[in-house]
């Protein structure tokens, strides 16, 4: 009886061990607000200023060359500046929870820390949204975010 049990158990163990040993890793799912997909053209994303000038955080995502996704938001702060940052906390980014807006604050969905909109994209390090560019380029009524800038936030979503 023990021999039959052992012979039935060995194939099951081998299947379970080797089924998870592929060379590809499964992408982790982003659990925060993904927002609108933005296609990259000529190594940049352009977003109409009038689409993001209402004081409400607008969430976006794109896929970098190679397929790595990045998630970000743009918000016009009370001081009148347009600000872009990763939708991932520099400390809690690995949780893939992102941020949400409460009035004039962005709130980390993981730790609950609040960040004034006027400070978004101005500070590196610590527990705040990772900055993309504190001086967003606006040309012909559009915001431009470059591939290199988006590569700078990639690590928060792997």
Question: Where are each of the predicted segments found?
Answer:
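Positively charged n-region of N-terminal signal peptides that target proteins for export
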Residues: 1-4
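Repetitive helical segments and hydrophobic/amphipathic motifs
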Residues: 11-12
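C-terminal motif of bacterial Sec signal peptides marking the signal peptidase cleavage site
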Residues: 17-20
């Amino acid at each position: 009886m023990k021999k039959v049990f052992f012979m039935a158990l060995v194939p099951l163990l081998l299947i379970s061990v080797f089924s998870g040993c592929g060379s590809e890793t499964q992408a982790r799912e982003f659990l925060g607000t993904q927002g609108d997909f933005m296609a990259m053209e000529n190594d940049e994303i352009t977003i109409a200023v009038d689409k993001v000038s209402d004081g409400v955080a607008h969430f976006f995502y794109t896929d970098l060359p190679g397929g790595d996704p990045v998630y970000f938001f743009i918000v016009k702060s009370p001081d009148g500046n347009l600000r872009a940052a990763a939708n991932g906390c520099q400390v809690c980014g690995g949780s893939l929870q992102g941020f949400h807006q409460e009035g004039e604050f962005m709130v980390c969905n993981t730790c609950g820390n609040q960040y004034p909109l006027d400070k978004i994209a101005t500070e590196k390090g610590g527990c705040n949204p990772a900055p993309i560019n504190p001086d967003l380029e606006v040309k012909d009524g559009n915001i431009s975010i470059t591939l290199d800038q988006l590569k700078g936030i990639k690590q928060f979503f792997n």
